[in-house]
């Protein structure tokens, strides 16, 4: 009822309570999701991303259809507070060259497998807190994410507002052109 329709469950506090906390979060969110997804609910469907049911699951996208739009959503964290076994239950991508290359591959494959009108990535960044300027390295990383097929990068972690910008990237993948703007 507060107006939250899409949740990012991937951040550095997600596994603070280990697997018990992750299981409790998934149970609570799915309970609300089930209530919201009934035909007589006055609220839009509830979607989420960022947690795995088992350690064997991979990062995957959440597919959302809303008012005629096909939307992909994925929430990933680059930082963890707890490095126990529960870390394998989060959508985690190490902020290393290898980790980021692996994430780019996942995102490209998702965009190809599920053609969409909009692809949103919720990314909990490994970056210094309380810094208002956007680093050139961050801009370069975001450009690569755009080239991989992401349309909106919903980045979070610095604890302060940072500037935002739009960029134009070239993609080899086809982009849907039959988009209707909903009122």
Listing of model-derived features with the role each one plays in the protein:
Residues 2-12, 42-52, 121-124, 150-161, ...:
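Active-site neighborhood of phospho(di)ester-bond hydrolases with catalytic His/Asp-centered motifs
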């Amino acid at each position: 009822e507060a107006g939250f329709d899409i949740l990012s469950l991937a951040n550095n506090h997600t596994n603070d309570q280990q697997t018990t906390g992750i299981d409790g979060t998934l149970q609570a969110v799915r309970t609300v999701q089930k209530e919201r997804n009934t035909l007589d609910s006055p609220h839009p469907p509830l979607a989420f991303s960022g947690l795995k049911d088992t350690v064997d699951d991979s990062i995957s996208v959440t597919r959302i259809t809303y008012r005629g739009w096909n939307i992909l959503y994925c929430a990933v964290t680059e930082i963890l507070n707890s490095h126990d076994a529960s870390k394998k239950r989060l959508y985690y991508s190490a902020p290393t060259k290898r980790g980021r290359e692996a994430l780019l591959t996942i995102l490209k494959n998702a965009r190809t497998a599920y053609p969409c009108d909009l692809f949103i990535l919720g990314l909990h960044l490994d970056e210094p807190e309380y810094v208002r300027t956007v680093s050139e390295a961050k801009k370069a990383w975001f450009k690569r994410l755009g080239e991989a097929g992401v349309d909106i990068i919903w980045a979070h972690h610095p604890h302060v507002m940072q500037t935002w910008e739009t960029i134009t990237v070239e993609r080899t993948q086809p982009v849907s052109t039959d988009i209707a703007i909903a009122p």
